[in-house]
């Protein structure tokens, strides 16, 4: 079965300013995949993964480029993919119980969005579904990363739709935020 991979992760500018930039970044990716049913059918397969930092995306500094293939999720050309890059501080905030909370909340948001968008033109529906998942991820990040004593990781920019329409596709996403800038290259293999 084909999978979606990160082919390359490049640190253009690590997060932080001043003294905060003296330490390297450890980054990880959140990915949501949801299959888009046709007609009035709402049955859908979803997947939520948390990948990294591991040895492949830790201690990243300005100009670092990591080219190890890192598997993220199953590939389905009829699915929507939304990804978010996170900078880890201390322990990873999206782990254990938090991962289950993300998965459950995203699945609820996805099912509701599928129901709301039945009958819409495909491009309009995909946009609405991607926006729903992006908003849900941002809300979850606020809870699990922004509440004192709950977490301290930092989202690098907003969640983004990853478009890989064919097995020969590659896509580059630009993640900018928290004064950091990363470029991720994704592929199907």
State what each model feature region is.
Residues 1-28:
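C2/C2-like lipid-binding beta-sandwich modules
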Residues 2, 14-17, 32, 36, ...:
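A composition-biased, non-transmembrane "mature-region" signal
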Residues 11-17, 85-90, 176:
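Short beta-strand-plus-loop segments that form exposed binding edges in beta-rich domains
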Residues 25-37, 85:
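Extended low-complexity, serine/threonine- and proline-enriched intrinsically disordered segments
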Residues 29, 60-120, 141-148:
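Eukaryotic beta-sheet cores, primarily in C2 and C2-like/PH beta-sandwich modules
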Residues 39-62, 159:
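Solvent-exposed serine/threonine-rich low-complexity stretches and specific carbohydrate-binding patches
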Residues 116-138:
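Membrane-interacting helical modules
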Residues 152-159, 163-189:
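Peripheral membrane interaction modules
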């Amino acid at each position: 079965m084909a999978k979606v991979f990160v082919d390359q992760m490049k640190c253009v500018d690590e997060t932080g300013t001043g003294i905060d930039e003296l330490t390297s970044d450890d980054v990880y990716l959140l990915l949501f995949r949801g299959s888009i049913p046709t007609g009035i059918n709402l049955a859908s397969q979803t997947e939520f993964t948390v990948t990294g930092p591991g040895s492949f995306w830790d201690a990243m500094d300005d100009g670092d480029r990591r080219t190890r293939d890192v598997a993220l999720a199953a590939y389905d050309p009829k699915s929507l993919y939304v990804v978010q890059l996170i900078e880890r501080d201390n322990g990873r905030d999206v782990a254990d119980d938090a991962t289950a909370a993300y998965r459950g909340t995203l699945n609820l948001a996805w099912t509701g969005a599928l129901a709301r968008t039945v009958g819409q033109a495909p491009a309009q529906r995909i946009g609405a579904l991607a926006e729903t998942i992006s908003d849900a991820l941002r809300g979850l990040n606020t809870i699990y990363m922004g509440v004192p004593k709950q977490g301290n990781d930092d989202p690098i920019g907003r969640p983004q739709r990853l478009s890989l329409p064919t097995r020969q596709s590659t896509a580059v996403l630009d993640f900018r935020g928290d004064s950091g800038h990363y470029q991720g290259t994704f592929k199907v293999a």
